[in-house]
Amino acid sequence: MRFSSPRYTLSLAVAAALLAPDGRTQTATPVSGNQEATTLDAVIVSGTARFKGLAKRDASFSITTASPEQIQQAVPQSTADLLKIVPGVWAEPSGGGTGANIFVRGMPSEGDAPFVTMQLDGSPLFPPPTLSFLENSTLFRVDDTVERMEVLRGGSSPIFSNGQPGLTVNFIQKKGQDEPEGSVRLTGGNNALRRIDVFNSGPMGNGWYYSVGGFFRETDGVRDPQFSADKGGQFSATLSKRWDNGELSFYARHTDDNNAFYTAIPLLSRNNGNDLSSFPGLNAQTGTLLGRDFRNVDLLVGPDGQTLRRDLADGRGVNIDVFGGEWNWESGGWTVADRFNVISGSAPTYALFTGDAPQRLGDFIASYGSSGSASYTNGGGVVDANQQVLEAGWWSVDKRLNSFTNDLRLSRELFAGNTLTVGAYYAKYSSADTWYLGNTMLLTAQNNARRIDVALDDGRQATRQGFTSTAFLNLRAKYDGENIAAFVADEWELSERLRLDLGARYERQSVTGDVHDTTTVDLDGNPATLYDNATSLALATTRRIDQNDEALSWTAGLNFTLDQHNSLFARVNSGVKFPGFDNLRDGQTRVQDVDQYELGLKSGTSVYDLYLTAFYNTFKNSPFQAFLANGENFTAVGDSRARGLEVEGAIRPFGGFELAGTGVWLDAKYRNYREFTGNQVMRQPKRQFRITPSYYWMLPFGDLKVFATYSYIGERFADLANSQRLPSYDMLDIGANLHVGEHWEVTASGSNVTDTLGLTEGNVRVPGAATGGVFMGRPIAGRQYQMSVAYRW
């Protein structure tokens, strides 16, 4: 090997061992002089029929893997933000630690993450990938208990697990090994970040192994809301029993974490949207409308003064318990694998949702057809009529979640080189929802906004404690879903170089639910109290949802090995996305059909890695819902198609230097979408790429690695009509990792160190709403720094 970096050389030489799918001790085969270990040797388990997995070079699909070091080097601000290292994926992390919008390969959606499934040790955390106000990355926190991440794009995923046609993100936990190990990590940073991570594992005797770990963190947040924006933690444990021919393991995880959720703020837009700047009094990189003035509120939700106490600090968080396990066994030529997962808990959203652009207070008062005056709700005197104000809703969404999943597979070699796998997947899940959407407040358009009360001269009362309205939607609903699927997969090594895999899946989904009817009332019966004249109330009567759907999915893949350094693959699949709870509630009952085609190249030596994938996909029956600028609640169903090219790779030309990168070119268009046919699929850039140079030094007392990542995000459109253009932007992250001796590690990193003002979304709740150069949008966070010190044993 030509590198002076023993740590890097070792990582290549034992790639297969480090990424082995089961927890039994693996022995790495030494690399001979005429055989180079490459990333193609790494064993992956996601998207494979058997629990043993297969080498990357033999996989006829696109998959990205990341070790703990690579995860740390990505400087992620959240679980969703970590996905920026995956080509073909666009994650919008600007909402904070949770509640991201994640898009995959031009697959159409207005937000959330309907084409992303989060797995823990191969089991989906929650079977439906997205509910309104809940995308699956919200349910997971990355910490030092994670051994690696595997991200499968398309490929064979429509056949296995929950049949996700888009992106499957599998976080694989560390398990106990023969040698005890552990770590303690302390992290600090700007915005008063304080965090501790712990991990410990080892043998218990008689083939039993354990691991425990978790974290606790508190911070003022990437945008300081005048209270702890992110506060909470997680605890995990695994227990494993190993035999010569199998393994049984269990895990438990409790997550109780609250995260402030950030939505659009006013910005200044000039030069046809190419030049963005901060709105006066509200810094685009660090500012937020959130503040202590309305952190704790009493929402008026019913007659006779009925109120609901809510706290913004609870944010978009989770209080979730997860319990699961897996059993892998080989006997008499048969292989049995079973995975199960149980989840129970709550995932609320208490957040501020903005609407139209700011205006003068005087103009706001005049809109009532009367003169009047205004004062701060919590003291501070009269508010000047020239003060810029806006209306924003204090939304309260409660979700109670429960689910159970089980994935059973039975495999046997039928003849030399041909292995057949049959399996069954079962999921039972529910969500109990209570929503109060609306609750509009009149706020000063400034950092840490303040509520304003208006007194009209004609005697009408426009506000109550700064609230100009109550809920426009009071939703009470209880949903239950059940999915049953049977699948078959055949892997056939036609020759030493040619490998074929085929698969089919039949699935049936049954959904029932009760949605309470609503009515709109004047809560106090007094038309002069304007703030409660149009209040949505849930009634005792309900509307029944009862729908059964079934579908067949299939896939075929071919992998051709050119030599030990190069292979080609082709893949075609046809999958579905069943309508979710919220789709069925809104009358969107069609099953979405997804067809995908892929061609790829995988190439690697000790000097370079290269993964190229060309893809094409088509969608039918894709639903869309949005509030347009004219007040129309627009819903539609249409089609789309996308084509693109993904690249992922690295080059190591000399010494400890490496230049890694990912990128995607995407052309995604709507089809059969009324007047929007031919428009670019919303919120997804045509081009994005990331380049990461790094250098590694051996030192007398340890080693040092420095790295930086330059990211470019191309222009996008915030809405279906392509009327809100989001300009391109670039940013720079930096970091360094120092090992001192065998035990100490120091890591320092900075994200967006150039303090770039980049926009991830416009105000999709009111598309096109912009006046006088003022634009409602959600920018990325400004410059952030953090440093950690770890001790390992």
Predicted stretch roles:
Residues 79-82, 101-106, 116-119, 136-139, ...:
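N-terminal periplasmic accessory domains that precede
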